[in-house]
């Protein structure tokens, strides 16, 4: 809680989000009312990317005109920024340095959705160097692809930058992350539906994601490899 607003972390469509809820501080709280009754305008902080991870950073002054936050994505290195409350401007304070002349504009990330055998929608994160799947986003050219999945302990595989990933992206290989049940990307239910007697959902979800990527033309059976391990 801050002076005049709340900052709330939540998840939407399998991604972390940060929402500001501004409070009506011009009137006194009436008997029987709670903080919820003072809630007014709501505003989600957007960093301008389809997929990103965002969270609140250290903010020792509740009345400060800036909100310190951190964010990143599959193509954006970890970044610390200030969100200016007066106009919504995002001011970058520090970003992790990537050696070798890294240019994020050469890469792309997108969200896809596969359909599981029971009808559940399974989110997929696809990361590639631009041009890997051709120039037509509606008719992708098949390319070598690594499909990764985990799906255990309610652990969410949220967008995050990796230098080592660039090596195979630059050589024309794509990465797809299957956010299968057993993880926490879609909330507690997502975890519950992928453990104990429902653990097979983790594996059938993964297969559904593989089938989807092939059917949509992102890769072929001969070009796809898969990776997973541990309890996933």
For the regions a language model picked out, list residue spans one by one:
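Short flexible coil/turn linkers enriched for glycine and charged/polar residues
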Residues: 12, 61-63, 74-75, 118-121
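Structural motif
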Residues: 14-22, 75-82
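Cap/lid segment of the alpha/beta-hydrolase catalytic domain
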Residues: 48-50, 57, 83-229
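Short beta-strand elements that form the blades of beta-propeller/WD-repeat-like
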Residues: 3-11, 63-72
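Repetitive beta-architecture junctions, highlighting loop-to-beta-strand starts
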Residues: 4, 16-18, 40, 65, ...
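Short loop/turn segments that connect beta-strands within beta-propeller blades
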Residues: 23-26, 85-86
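Catalytic nucleophile loop
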Residues: 232
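Beta-propeller fold detector
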Residues: 30-47, 90-97
